[in-house]
Amino acid sequence: MSAQPISDFYAYPDAAGHFGQFGGRFVAETLIGPLQELSAAYDQARQDPSFIAEYDKDLKHYVGRPSPIYHAERLSREVGGAQILLKREDLNHTGAHKINNTIGQALLASRMGKTRIIAETGAGQHGVASATVAARLGLECVVYMGATDIERQKINVYRMKLLGATVIPVTSGSATLKDALNEAMRDWVTNVRDTFYIIGTVAGPDPYPRMVRDFNAIVGREAREQMLQDYGRLPDAISACVGGGSNAIGLFHAFLNDPGVKIYGAEAAGDGIATGRHAASIAAGRPGVLHGNRTYVICDDDGQITETHSISAGLDYPGVGPEHSFLSDSGRAVYQGITDDEAMAAFHLLAHTEGILAALESSHAVAQSIKLARELPRDALVLCNLSGRGDKDVHTIAAREGIAL
Protein backbone atom coordinates (compact mmCIF):
# COMPACT_ATOMS: atom_id res chain seq x y z
CA MET A 1 0.00 0.00 0.00
CA SER A 2 1.53 3.30 -1.06
CA ALA A 3 0.97 6.27 1.23
CA GLN A 4 -0.75 9.27 -0.33
CA PRO A 5 0.24 12.66 1.13
CA ILE A 6 -2.90 14.20 2.68
CA SER A 7 -2.85 17.83 3.83
CA ASP A 8 -6.31 17.91 5.45
CA PHE A 9 -8.12 14.77 6.53
CA TYR A 10 -11.25 16.80 7.26
CA ALA A 11 -11.75 17.38 3.53
CA TYR A 12 -13.17 13.85 3.28
CA PRO A 13 -15.49 12.43 2.18
CA ASP A 14 -16.03 14.37 -1.04
CA ALA A 15 -19.47 15.35 -2.31
CA ALA A 16 -20.03 11.83 -3.68
CA GLY A 17 -19.17 10.17 -0.37
CA HIS A 18 -15.69 9.01 -1.36
CA PHE A 19 -12.66 8.76 0.91
CA GLY A 20 -10.08 8.58 -1.84
CA GLN A 21 -10.86 5.36 -3.73
CA PHE A 22 -13.10 4.09 -0.92
CA GLY A 23 -16.70 4.72 0.10
CA GLY A 24 -19.34 5.79 -2.40
CA ARG A 25 -22.81 4.42 -3.01
CA PHE A 26 -22.88 0.97 -4.64
CA VAL A 27 -26.53 -0.01 -4.26
CA ALA A 28 -29.56 -1.19 -6.21
CA GLU A 29 -31.57 1.47 -8.03
CA THR A 30 -34.39 1.06 -5.50
CA LEU A 31 -32.16 2.46 -2.74
CA ILE A 32 -30.86 5.54 -4.58
CA GLY A 33 -33.95 7.61 -3.79
CA PRO A 34 -34.08 6.72 -0.08
CA LEU A 35 -30.36 7.41 0.30
CA GLN A 36 -30.70 10.78 -1.42
CA GLU A 37 -33.63 11.63 0.88
CA LEU A 38 -31.61 10.58 3.93
CA SER A 39 -28.54 12.52 2.82
CA ALA A 40 -30.54 15.71 2.26
CA ALA A 41 -32.33 15.35 5.61
CA TYR A 42 -29.07 14.78 7.46
CA ASP A 43 -27.27 17.69 5.79
CA GLN A 44 -30.17 19.95 6.75
CA ALA A 45 -30.37 18.66 10.34
CA ARG A 46 -26.64 18.93 11.05
CA GLN A 47 -26.81 22.65 10.28
CA ASP A 48 -29.97 23.24 12.35
CA PRO A 49 -29.09 24.66 15.81
CA SER A 50 -32.29 23.23 17.32
CA PHE A 51 -31.44 19.69 16.17
CA ILE A 52 -27.89 20.00 17.49
CA ALA A 53 -29.17 21.38 20.80
CA GLU A 54 -31.61 18.48 21.19
CA TYR A 55 -28.86 15.96 20.40
CA ASP A 56 -26.44 17.60 22.85
CA LYS A 57 -29.12 17.68 25.54
CA ASP A 58 -29.76 13.94 25.20
CA LEU A 59 -26.02 13.18 25.25
CA LYS A 60 -25.71 15.02 28.55
CA HIS A 61 -28.91 14.12 30.38
CA TYR A 62 -29.82 10.72 28.85
CA VAL A 63 -26.50 9.16 27.82
CA GLY A 64 -24.54 10.69 30.70
CA ARG A 65 -21.77 12.43 28.78
CA PRO A 66 -19.03 13.46 29.05
CA SER A 67 -17.41 10.09 29.72
CA PRO A 68 -14.20 10.40 31.79
CA ILE A 69 -10.62 9.55 30.94
CA TYR A 70 -9.26 7.20 33.60
CA HIS A 71 -5.55 6.67 34.28
CA ALA A 72 -5.11 2.91 34.61
CA GLU A 73 -2.18 3.24 37.02
CA ARG A 74 -1.97 -0.36 38.25
CA LEU A 75 -2.31 -1.73 34.71
CA SER A 76 0.41 0.66 33.55
CA ARG A 77 2.76 -0.45 36.36
CA GLU A 78 2.06 -4.11 35.65
CA VAL A 79 2.76 -3.70 31.94
CA GLY A 80 5.76 -1.37 32.24
CA GLY A 81 6.46 1.43 29.82
CA ALA A 82 3.96 4.14 28.91
CA GLN A 83 0.98 5.27 30.94
CA ILE A 84 -2.31 3.74 29.73
CA LEU A 85 -5.37 5.98 29.81
CA LEU A 86 -8.91 4.70 29.21
CA LYS A 87 -11.68 6.71 27.55
CA ARG A 88 -14.60 5.23 29.50
CA GLU A 89 -17.33 4.76 26.88
CA ASP A 90 -18.38 1.69 28.89
CA LEU A 91 -19.94 4.10 31.40
CA ASN A 92 -22.50 5.45 28.93
CA HIS A 93 -26.18 4.54 29.28
CA THR A 94 -26.56 1.02 27.74
CA GLY A 95 -22.86 0.31 28.37
CA ALA A 96 -21.12 1.23 25.13
CA HIS A 97 -20.41 3.95 22.57
CA LYS A 98 -23.27 2.78 20.34
CA ILE A 99 -25.86 5.10 21.86
CA ASN A 100 -23.93 8.18 20.67
CA ASN A 101 -24.98 7.21 17.16
CA THR A 102 -28.42 5.71 17.76
CA ILE A 103 -29.74 8.75 19.61
CA GLY A 104 -28.64 10.97 16.72
CA GLN A 105 -30.16 8.78 14.02
CA ALA A 106 -33.38 8.25 15.99
CA LEU A 107 -33.82 12.01 16.39
CA LEU A 108 -33.29 12.31 12.63
CA ALA A 109 -35.86 9.55 12.00
CA SER A 110 -38.44 11.43 14.06
CA ARG A 111 -37.59 14.65 12.24
CA MET A 112 -38.22 12.85 8.91
CA GLY A 113 -41.59 11.57 10.11
CA LYS A 114 -40.58 7.90 10.26
CA THR A 115 -42.46 5.75 12.79
CA ARG A 116 -40.43 2.52 12.59
CA ILE A 117 -36.72 1.94 12.97
CA ILE A 118 -34.75 -1.15 12.04
CA ALA A 119 -31.20 -2.09 12.95
CA GLU A 120 -28.66 -4.85 12.55
CA THR A 121 -26.53 -6.00 15.45
CA GLY A 122 -23.62 -8.35 16.13
CA ALA A 123 -22.63 -8.12 19.78
CA GLY A 124 -26.09 -6.83 20.56
CA GLN A 125 -24.93 -3.44 21.86
CA HIS A 126 -26.18 -1.57 18.79
CA GLY A 127 -29.44 -3.48 18.99
CA VAL A 128 -29.84 -2.54 22.65
CA ALA A 129 -28.96 1.09 21.93
CA SER A 130 -31.47 1.18 19.03
CA ALA A 131 -34.21 -0.40 21.15
CA THR A 132 -33.41 2.06 23.92
CA VAL A 133 -33.79 5.19 21.81
CA ALA A 134 -36.88 3.75 20.10
CA ALA A 135 -38.51 3.40 23.51
CA ARG A 136 -37.32 6.89 24.43
CA LEU A 137 -38.95 8.41 21.30
CA GLY A 138 -41.97 6.11 20.96
CA LEU A 139 -40.88 4.37 17.76
CA GLU A 140 -41.43 0.77 16.68
CA CYS A 141 -38.13 -1.15 16.63
CA VAL A 142 -37.10 -4.31 14.75
CA VAL A 143 -33.58 -5.70 15.16
CA TYR A 144 -31.97 -8.23 12.81
CA MET A 145 -29.38 -10.47 14.44
CA GLY A 146 -27.49 -13.52 13.19
CA ALA A 147 -28.55 -16.78 14.82
CA THR A 148 -24.92 -17.46 15.78
CA ASP A 149 -24.72 -14.11 17.55
CA ILE A 150 -28.09 -14.64 19.26
CA GLU A 151 -26.64 -17.79 20.82
CA ARG A 152 -23.52 -16.04 22.14
CA GLN A 153 -25.28 -12.83 23.21
CA LYS A 154 -28.42 -14.10 24.95
CA ILE A 155 -28.35 -11.39 27.61
CA ASN A 156 -28.44 -8.57 25.07
CA VAL A 157 -31.20 -10.33 23.10
CA TYR A 158 -33.37 -10.37 26.21
CA ARG A 159 -32.48 -6.75 26.98
CA MET A 160 -33.76 -5.74 23.52
CA LYS A 161 -37.01 -7.59 24.11
CA LEU A 162 -37.43 -5.98 27.54
CA LEU A 163 -37.11 -2.60 25.81
CA GLY A 164 -39.95 -3.49 23.44
CA ALA A 165 -38.00 -4.44 20.32
CA THR A 166 -38.71 -7.39 18.03
CA VAL A 167 -35.57 -9.47 17.42
CA ILE A 168 -35.51 -11.40 14.13
CA PRO A 169 -32.97 -14.25 13.86
CA VAL A 170 -31.01 -14.43 10.60
CA THR A 171 -29.94 -17.94 9.59
CA SER A 172 -28.50 -17.28 6.13
CA GLY A 173 -24.76 -17.38 5.38
CA SER A 174 -22.63 -17.53 8.51
CA ALA A 175 -25.59 -16.21 10.57
CA THR A 176 -23.51 -13.30 11.89
CA LEU A 177 -23.30 -9.53 11.47
CA LYS A 178 -22.92 -9.30 7.68
CA ASP A 179 -26.00 -11.49 7.19
CA ALA A 180 -28.03 -9.41 9.64
CA LEU A 181 -27.04 -6.29 7.70
CA ASN A 182 -28.17 -7.91 4.44
CA GLU A 183 -31.61 -8.70 5.88
CA ALA A 184 -32.01 -5.23 7.36
CA MET A 185 -31.28 -3.67 3.97
CA ARG A 186 -33.94 -5.89 2.36
CA ASP A 187 -36.45 -4.73 4.97
CA TRP A 188 -35.59 -1.09 4.34
CA VAL A 189 -36.11 -1.38 0.58
CA THR A 190 -39.55 -2.90 1.18
CA ASN A 191 -40.73 -0.51 3.90
CA VAL A 192 -38.87 2.71 3.17
CA ARG A 193 -41.96 4.92 3.39
CA ASP A 194 -42.30 4.61 7.18
CA THR A 195 -38.98 2.98 8.12
CA PHE A 196 -35.59 4.44 9.07
CA TYR A 197 -32.57 2.13 8.99
CA ILE A 198 -30.13 2.87 11.82
CA ILE A 199 -26.82 1.36 10.67
CA GLY A 200 -24.58 0.76 13.66
CA THR A 201 -21.16 1.25 12.14
CA VAL A 202 -19.27 3.52 9.74
CA ALA A 203 -19.93 1.22 6.78
CA GLY A 204 -22.74 1.07 4.25
CA PRO A 205 -23.47 3.47 1.39
CA ASP A 206 -23.10 7.25 1.71
CA PRO A 207 -24.25 9.07 3.86
CA TYR A 208 -23.94 6.37 6.55
CA PRO A 209 -20.12 6.35 6.97
CA ARG A 210 -19.95 10.11 7.54
CA MET A 211 -23.21 10.31 9.50
CA VAL A 212 -22.26 7.55 11.96
CA ARG A 213 -18.77 9.08 12.25
CA ASP A 214 -20.21 12.52 13.01
CA PHE A 215 -22.50 11.19 15.74
CA ASN A 216 -19.59 9.29 17.35
CA ALA A 217 -17.07 12.12 16.95
CA ILE A 218 -18.10 13.43 20.38
CA VAL A 219 -15.78 10.74 21.79
CA GLY A 220 -12.66 12.24 20.23
CA ARG A 221 -13.68 15.86 20.78
CA GLU A 222 -14.17 15.20 24.49
CA ALA A 223 -10.95 13.18 24.73
CA ARG A 224 -8.86 15.87 23.03
CA GLU A 225 -10.19 18.55 25.38
CA GLN A 226 -9.78 16.30 28.44
CA MET A 227 -6.18 15.46 27.53
CA LEU A 228 -5.24 19.13 27.20
CA GLN A 229 -7.06 20.03 30.40
CA ASP A 230 -5.88 17.14 32.60
CA TYR A 231 -2.44 16.37 31.14
CA GLY A 232 -1.50 19.58 29.36
CA ARG A 233 -0.82 17.78 26.10
CA LEU A 234 -2.16 15.33 23.56
CA PRO A 235 -1.51 11.58 23.84
CA ASP A 236 1.45 10.05 22.06
CA ALA A 237 -0.72 7.25 20.69
CA ILE A 238 -4.41 6.35 20.57
CA SER A 239 -5.94 2.91 20.12
CA ALA A 240 -9.41 1.51 19.45
CA CYS A 241 -10.85 -1.80 18.27
CA VAL A 242 -12.02 -1.99 14.66
CA GLY A 243 -14.76 -4.21 13.27
CA GLY A 244 -16.79 -1.84 11.15
CA GLY A 245 -14.98 0.83 13.12
CA SER A 246 -17.50 3.29 14.60
CA ASN A 247 -15.95 3.64 18.06
CA ALA A 248 -12.51 3.92 16.48
CA ILE A 249 -13.36 6.66 13.99
CA GLY A 250 -15.22 8.43 16.80
CA LEU A 251 -11.97 8.64 18.75
CA PHE A 252 -9.60 9.07 15.80
CA HIS A 253 -11.42 11.90 14.04
CA ALA A 254 -10.47 14.69 16.45
CA PHE A 255 -6.78 13.77 16.16
CA LEU A 256 -6.43 13.21 12.40
CA ASN A 257 -4.67 16.53 11.75
CA ASP A 258 -2.37 16.15 14.79
CA PRO A 259 0.77 14.53 13.32
CA GLY A 260 2.28 14.02 16.78
CA VAL A 261 -0.50 11.60 17.72
CA LYS A 262 0.02 8.11 16.33
CA ILE A 263 -3.20 6.26 15.53
CA TYR A 264 -3.69 2.50 15.90
CA GLY A 265 -6.65 0.25 15.16
CA ALA A 266 -6.97 -3.24 16.64
CA GLU A 267 -8.58 -5.74 14.26
CA ALA A 268 -9.75 -9.22 15.19
CA ALA A 269 -7.03 -11.72 14.28
CA GLY A 270 -9.13 -14.57 15.71
CA ASP A 271 -7.11 -17.79 15.80
CA GLY A 272 -4.29 -16.00 13.96
CA ILE A 273 -4.25 -14.40 10.52
CA ALA A 274 -2.19 -17.27 9.10
CA THR A 275 -4.97 -19.74 10.01
CA GLY A 276 -7.55 -17.95 7.87
CA ARG A 277 -9.89 -17.85 10.89
CA HIS A 278 -9.95 -14.12 11.57
CA ALA A 279 -11.78 -10.87 10.79
CA ALA A 280 -8.86 -8.56 10.00
CA SER A 281 -10.13 -6.82 6.88
CA ILE A 282 -7.32 -4.28 6.51
CA ALA A 283 -4.44 -6.41 7.76
CA ALA A 284 -5.39 -9.39 5.56
CA GLY A 285 -8.04 -8.23 3.08
CA ARG A 286 -8.19 -6.50 -0.28
CA PRO A 287 -10.31 -3.71 -1.81
CA GLY A 288 -13.82 -4.75 -2.82
CA VAL A 289 -17.47 -3.76 -2.50
CA LEU A 290 -19.56 -4.80 0.49
CA HIS A 291 -22.86 -3.42 1.80
CA GLY A 292 -22.92 -0.47 -0.56
CA ASN A 293 -19.38 0.87 -0.26
CA ARG A 294 -15.90 0.18 -1.56
CA THR A 295 -13.53 -0.78 1.22
CA TYR A 296 -11.15 -3.50 2.36
CA VAL A 297 -12.94 -6.84 2.59
CA ILE A 298 -12.07 -10.45 3.36
CA CYS A 299 -12.69 -12.44 0.20
CA ASP A 300 -11.37 -15.25 -1.96
CA ASP A 301 -9.48 -14.94 -5.25
CA ASP A 302 -12.79 -14.61 -7.11
CA GLY A 303 -13.87 -11.67 -4.96
CA GLN A 304 -16.47 -13.65 -3.01
CA ILE A 305 -16.83 -12.66 0.65
CA THR A 306 -15.52 -15.41 2.91
CA GLU A 307 -16.54 -16.35 6.44
CA THR A 308 -14.80 -14.67 9.34
CA HIS A 309 -14.07 -15.63 12.93
CA SER A 310 -13.63 -13.73 16.16
CA ILE A 311 -14.46 -14.51 19.77
CA SER A 312 -15.99 -11.04 19.69
CA ALA A 313 -19.37 -10.88 17.92
CA GLY A 314 -19.00 -7.14 17.34
CA LEU A 315 -15.75 -7.57 15.38
CA ASP A 316 -16.89 -10.63 13.41
CA TYR A 317 -17.42 -8.74 10.12
CA PRO A 318 -15.68 -9.24 6.74
CA GLY A 319 -15.37 -5.53 5.94
CA VAL A 320 -14.47 -2.22 7.55
CA GLY A 321 -15.63 1.38 7.28
CA PRO A 322 -14.26 3.08 4.13
CA GLU A 323 -12.63 5.90 6.08
CA HIS A 324 -10.49 3.34 7.90
CA SER A 325 -9.40 1.88 4.56
CA PHE A 326 -8.49 5.41 3.47
CA LEU A 327 -6.59 6.15 6.69
CA SER A 328 -4.63 2.92 6.29
CA ASP A 329 -3.69 3.54 2.66
CA SER A 330 -2.72 7.15 3.42
CA GLY A 331 -0.44 5.98 6.22
CA ARG A 332 -2.23 8.06 8.86
CA ALA A 333 -3.36 5.04 10.88
CA VAL A 334 -1.88 1.60 11.46
CA TYR A 335 -4.16 -1.44 11.79
CA GLN A 336 -2.89 -4.52 13.60
CA GLY A 337 -4.38 -7.93 14.28
CA ILE A 338 -5.08 -8.98 17.88
CA THR A 339 -5.86 -12.67 18.45
CA ASP A 340 -8.65 -14.11 20.58
CA ASP A 341 -6.06 -15.27 23.12
CA GLU A 342 -4.44 -11.82 23.32
CA ALA A 343 -7.83 -10.17 23.83
CA MET A 344 -8.73 -12.69 26.55
CA ALA A 345 -5.44 -12.09 28.36
CA ALA A 346 -6.02 -8.32 28.24
CA PHE A 347 -9.58 -8.80 29.53
CA HIS A 348 -8.31 -10.67 32.59
CA LEU A 349 -5.37 -8.34 33.23
CA LEU A 350 -7.59 -5.24 33.17
CA ALA A 351 -10.11 -6.93 35.46
CA HIS A 352 -7.45 -7.97 37.97
CA THR A 353 -5.50 -4.68 38.01
CA GLU A 354 -8.28 -2.10 37.68
CA GLY A 355 -11.57 -3.81 38.56
CA ILE A 356 -12.99 -3.14 35.10
CA LEU A 357 -14.68 -5.77 32.92
CA ALA A 358 -14.18 -4.65 29.32
CA ALA A 359 -16.20 -5.92 26.38
CA LEU A 360 -14.36 -8.51 24.30
CA GLU A 361 -14.35 -5.99 21.44
CA SER A 362 -12.71 -3.35 23.65
CA SER A 363 -10.30 -5.96 25.04
CA HIS A 364 -8.68 -6.08 21.60
CA ALA A 365 -7.82 -2.38 21.98
CA VAL A 366 -6.61 -2.95 25.55
CA ALA A 367 -4.30 -5.69 24.25
CA GLN A 368 -2.98 -3.38 21.54
CA SER A 369 -2.47 -0.55 24.06
CA ILE A 370 -0.48 -2.90 26.29
CA LYS A 371 1.80 -3.75 23.35
CA LEU A 372 2.23 -0.07 22.50
CA ALA A 373 2.95 0.87 26.13
CA ARG A 374 5.75 -1.69 26.35
CA GLU A 375 7.49 -0.04 23.39
CA LEU A 376 7.29 3.52 24.79
CA PRO A 377 8.98 5.38 27.68
CA ARG A 378 7.27 5.75 31.07
CA ASP A 379 6.29 9.38 30.47
CA ALA A 380 4.50 8.58 27.19
CA LEU A 381 0.69 8.53 27.13
CA VAL A 382 -1.38 5.87 25.35
CA LEU A 383 -5.11 6.60 25.15
CA CYS A 384 -7.30 3.51 24.69
CA ASN A 385 -10.97 3.71 23.79
CA LEU A 386 -12.75 1.39 26.22
CA SER A 387 -15.76 1.22 23.94
CA GLY A 388 -18.00 -1.07 25.99
CA ARG A 389 -18.44 -3.04 29.19
CA GLY A 390 -18.04 -6.79 29.40
CA ASP A 391 -21.17 -7.94 31.24
CA LYS A 392 -22.57 -9.26 27.94
CA ASP A 393 -19.50 -11.47 27.42
CA VAL A 394 -19.30 -13.24 30.78
CA HIS A 395 -21.04 -16.38 29.47
CA THR A 396 -18.80 -16.49 26.36
CA ILE A 397 -15.66 -16.16 28.46
CA ALA A 398 -16.81 -18.77 30.98
CA ALA A 399 -17.68 -21.24 28.21
CA ARG A 400 -14.28 -20.73 26.56
CA GLU A 401 -12.59 -21.47 29.88
CA GLY A 402 -14.75 -24.53 30.56
CA ILE A 403 -16.74 -22.98 33.37
CA ALA A 404 -20.47 -23.75 33.61
CA LEU A 405 -22.65 -20.88 34.80
From Swiss-Prot:
GO terms for molecular function: tryptophan synthase activity. It comes from Xanthomonas axonopodis pv. citri (strain 306). Its cofactor is pyridoxal 5'-phosphate. Belongs to the TrpB family. Keywords: Amino-acid biosynthesis, Aromatic amino acid biosynthesis, Lyase, Pyridoxal phosphate, Tryptophan biosynthesis. Its EC number is 4.2.1.20. InterPro entries: Trp_synth_b_CS, Trp_synth_beta, Trp_synth_beta/beta-like, TrpB-like_PALP, TrpB-like_PALP_sf. The modification N6-(pyridoxal phosphate)lysine is found at residue 98. It comes from the Bacteria. This is Tryptophan synthase beta chain. HAMAP family: Trp_synth_beta. Pathway: Amino-acid biosynthesis; L-tryptophan biosynthesis; L-tryptophan from chorismate: step 5/5. GO terms for cellular component: cytoplasm. Tetramer of two alpha and two beta chains. It holds the Pfam family PALP. The beta subunit is responsible for the synthesis of L-tryptophan from indole and L-serine. It catalyses: (1S,2R)-1-C-(indol-3-yl)glycerol 3-phosphate + L-serine = D-glyceraldehyde 3-phosphate + L-tryptophan + H2O.
